Amino acid sequence: MLDAKYIKDNLQQVAEKLATRGYQFDIAEFEAQEQKRRHLQERTQDLQSQRNTISKEIGQKKAKGEDTSDIFAKVNQINEELKIIEKELKDLQDTINQTLLSMPNLPADDVPVGKDENDNVEIRRWGTPREFHPEAPAKDHADIGEILKMIDFKAAAKVTGSRFMVLKNKIAKLHRALSQFMLDLHTEKHGYEELYVPYLVNNDSLYGTGQLPKFAADLFKLEGDFEYSLIPTAEVPITNLVRDEILDTETLPRYYTAHTPCFRSEAGSYGRDTKGMIRQHQFEKVELVHITAADKGEESLELLTSHAEKVLQKLNLPYRVMKLCTGDMSFSAKKTYDLEVWLPSQNTYREISSCSWCGDFQARRMKARHKNPSMKKPELVHTLNGSGLAVGRTLLAIIENYQQEDGSIMVPDALIKYMGGISVIK
């Protein structure tokens, strides 16, 4: 959530920046609401002051044995008016808060202005895409998996529906090996604290990280007495661990990681990536979350991104880093780098990780702060998150980049020990 005071002091600048994110901020409406709010607040304070003065007068009259019935009538009149105005003020404040909750984060100054993914800017590349012989072109991961009888989309469709999969045998083992490899790399080499977190979260958590109220349609919600939803990403439970907390500044930065399933309805993705593992309702990720002080937020994004990149480098998977434009960033992000891995069957790069610096946007929603003895009052932390990596997409990238002409799949060197010595899947 944006700082209301900052908005009031920088209305035109905020409107211009929000416009680059596709959000139309009605300055006149906002100013009218603020003017009305101030009027109601001033009237409330005036009535409360009158009531306090009269209450003292009642006490004085009672001490003298004088009649106070007329004054009590005036107090009752004030109380009735206060009740009406306080409700009106509350309703108006709720409306203003809903407006604030609907606003996306303001982009950092160096974020390119653009409408969609076509306006993203390439920062760097790593690795050289493998060339396939024209007579033996690269096969799609779904075809390879089905030929090996180790990826079964039909069985998943029977059990559940579309956009699910069943992994079998050595490909299931490779999927598990990947998550273990990623966790070990981040905890042993990059200094992350590993967590096991709930896969169900409450609405407060979803508001905290920005999924609600705007993206309710993307969630899988439980029916019944519990207002719980399945997590769309481990960012939600991990980041909300610091909700309503005042952290000791000396404990920052904090680096957290967790391996979880993720569940998304893909409400806006009808007809896209219907074949294969690219876009599933259920998938797994190893999530990375940083909690930092404000002055370390932007540099922490570079560090987090490098940690996600290291996974791809260890697996020798060619990729590129893209700086997202204003129109393609997620709702809560201030600045985002996407890692895109090379997929031979599509002859292009596809997203495998999104690393975002959210500034104090989520922290303001969560009331997540930090303090040390030299600070006059607690300050909002900065939050960052990224995939390190999406396990399913990494799996399909390995299947495609390590496929052999005989239909087998070579296991990357970094994963052989996690595969119990298996170096070829066939």
Swiss-Prot record:
CDD domains linked: SerRS_core
GO molecular function, one term: serine-tRNA ligase activity
Enzyme class: ligase
Bias-annotated ranges (Polar residues): 46-55
Pfam families (alphabetical): Seryl_tRNA_N, tRNA-synt_2b
Binding sites annotated in the UniProt record for L-serine: T233, A234, E235, E287, S387
Subcellular location: Cytoplasm
Binding positions (ATP): R264, S265, E266, E351, I352, S353, S354
Residue stretches spanning the membrane: none
EC number, as in UniProt: 6.1.1.11
Keyword Aminoacyl-tRNA synthetase: yes
Region feature (Disordered): 36-66
Domain free text: Consists of two distinct domains, a catalytic core and a N-terminal extension that is involved in tRNA binding.
Family stated for the protein in its record: Belongs to the class-II aminoacyl-tRNA synthetase family. Type-1 seryl-tRNA synthetase subfamily.
Entry function: Catalyzes the attachment of serine to tRNA(Ser). Is also able to aminoacylate tRNA(Sec) with serine, to form the misacylated tRNA L-seryl-tRNA(Sec), which will be further converted into selenocysteinyl-tRNA(Sec).
Quaternary structure and partners: Homodimer. The tRNA molecule binds across the dimer.
Entry protein name: Serine--tRNA ligase
Organism in which the protein naturally occurs: Francisella tularensis subsp. novicida (strain U112)
Gene: serS
